[in-house]
Amino acid sequence: MTRRQTLTLVAAILGSGVATIDGSIVNVALPAIERDLGGGLTGQQWVSNAYLLALASLILIGGSLGDVYGERRVFAIGIGAFGVLSLACALAPTIETLIAARALQGAAGALVTPSSLAIIIGAFSAAERGAAIGAWTAWGGIAAIVGPLAGGWIVDQVSWRWIFAINVPLVIVTLGLILAAVPPAGARSGRRVDVVGAILCVVGLGGVVFALIEQPNHGWSSPVIFLPLVVGVVAFAAFVVYERRAKEPMLELELFTHRNFAVGNVETFAMYAGLGILFFFLVIFLQQVAGYSALESGLATVPVTVVMFALSRRFGALADRHGPRLFMGAGPLIAAVGIVLLLRTGLDTSYATDVLPAMLVFAVGLSMTVAPLTATVLADAEESDAGIASAVNNAVARVAGLIGVSILGVVVAQTLVGDTFAANDESVRAFHQVVVVCAVLVAGGGIVGVLGIVNPRRTVEARNCPGGQLVAVPLPAVESTTAAD
């Protein structure tokens, strides 16, 4: 590996790591943010969802901008903006200001996430990319462990504001590396950005999710809820119609005529809706109901990342050898069993007996699922569509978690006393409702996999698929390695 390649890889790891961790590290700080700035459960949801909504809504256009203007330029602009907006989050005087800054931060992350892996692919030859992507994935897993731990410690010992401020020096280092290591490239002719599709997608998702989150405060009959909901549904329908006719669509709808691609994305949606709900509400429950500190709640989910880091590649290799269908079916069912074990939690929750066993069983099931699922989706797309196929799968995973948390927020708010979790029986009952819904969604994903997945037209090495961080959200781009019809 040359010096330039090493610097490029480090820059990509730092950039994607900062953007990804900021989507999850904030969860351990939500109770502290609520105590400082207010906002109740709705405010907590929006601090998390504003970032995820912007990231998921714009990630496809972020990839398109990289194709048109060059990944180096888009990555540098994205990571620079991310640093500025991290500082804005750290200095936010109100919950509304923080939510706005988080939304803009998510937009910057949508530029960084797809371009980081594209930069690696451009810097390494085909023979070298496997090792480079493996290093990128491995360090992403390590960052996923360190991030929540460091976030919990920072919240307990200093202030929640520093979980955002700490990004600034990392961004400065990343900018220096990327500008020094990656040569500039001009805009690429013949490519256009699907601006209309991007706007329709953002309006569609934003309207629907806003209505779901704010409904408990206003009711369905309020114009504040009804109008955004209608606008969102109409805009998303228009997005689908427009993408069918666009010459250069943001989303290639033809991909969904491929069976494994379509079924795999349905399983992805079910799985990651359940995972997004679980991790959002578990951290809040452990802190506000079970009495854990921010650091302790961050530590609670570390076994999931450790097990996945140890087992995902091994299960990916087994799926390459025996086919993905078994793993895409059995894995989610095992993960669902782990989730059900969280029904043992209550006001007096023991980590060793009530939480840890659930996390371990859940992690084994998730490890069986993620790499085969990602590989199968990619294998059912043409070689020329591998990038967009990965981006779609990434977006489906992120949007699923976003919608899942929004809908469950509506349900849970009906059970809670005072729109927030507290150490009472109503909060325990609300969390157990969340657990059941998560288990059903994840198990449903497994059933979809068993019934719908067939052997792909060509094989993608699952063990080489980048698996994401804490909950292994699929990340953009992976290379097909063999052809088998």
Explain the meaning of each model-derived region.
Residues 95, 159, 186-190, 215-221, ...:
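Membrane-interface helix caps and helix-loop-helix hairpins in membrane proteins
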Residues 127, 173-202, 244-259, 320-321, ...:
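Flexible interhelical linker loops that connect adjacent transmembrane helices
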Residues 210-219, 377:
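Juxtamembrane C-cap of transmembrane helices in multi-pass membrane transport proteins
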Residues 1-180, 311, 315, 321-322, ...:
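Transmembrane-helix bundle of Major Facilitator Superfamily
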